[in-house]
Swiss-Prot record:
GO cellular component terms, semicolon-separated: host cell nuclear matrix; viral tegument
Family statement: Belongs to the alphaherpesvirinae HHV-1 UL55 family.
Source organism of this protein record: Gallid herpesvirus 2 (strain Chicken/Md5/ATCC VR-987) (GaHV-2)
Main location: virion
GO biological process terms, semicolon-separated: viral life cycle
UniProt protein name: Tegument protein UL55 homolog
Family matches, as Pfam families: Herpes_UL55
Compartments, record wording: Virion tegument; Host nucleus matrix
Gene name of this polypeptide: MDV070
């Protein structure tokens, strides 16, 4: 089995994704990319106490900004962590094919989690994907366009997984 490949029984355990939710902009430019690997990034513009775990695996020293895409599954199911990790890895592998070695970022996709602390005793975790970029004009028209294209590609991959793996 190729690196990053999963067995058909493991693929069957990934919940069906029926919709990739439109991107949510996350301004991380004041945070180093290294810190984005496993530390929650707080979000101050939210009604609840919200933070993001973006798990960016980029080796670029440049600041980045990100978009969170929720993955809507069946009403009775939730996206699993290994499912989101698999989808992110697959997206990066598809993107890497045909790219030159000197391009800025080879891993713009990662498994991400929204952490909503609804009260002291309960945190809601929403699993999804992060798409990050290093463009100079963060959240410009071109940047948003790239994010929506990324979302469309995620939706196509999720459709393929639904059709051929379940």
């Amino acid at each position: 089995m190729a690196a990053g490949a999963m067995s058909s029984s493991t693929l069957a355990q990934i919940p069906n994704v029926y919709q990739v939710i439109d991107p949510l902009a996350i301004d991380t430019s004041s945070t180093s990319t290294k810190r984005l690997l496993d530390e929650p990034v707080p979000h101050i513009g939210s009604i609840t106490s919200r933070s993001y775990l973006l798990r960016v695996k980029c080796s670029s020293p440049e600041d980045c900004h990100a978009f969170f895409f929720g993955l809507a599954t069946e009403a009775s199911g939730n996206m699993s962590q290994h499912g989101a990790e698999y989808i992110a890895r697959s997206m990066n592998e598809k993107l890497y094919t045909g790219r030159s070695a000197d391009e800025l970022c080879h891993t713009p996709f990662s498994h991400a989690t929204i952490l909503d602390s609804l009260d002291d005793n309960y945190t809601l975790n929403i699993e999804g994907l992060c798409y990050h970029c290093h463009c100079e004009n963060k959240f410009s028209h071109e940047c948003w366009k790239a994010a929506f294209i990324a979302g469309e590609k995620m939706a196509l991959l999720c459709k393929d997984l639904r059709m051929y793996c379940h």
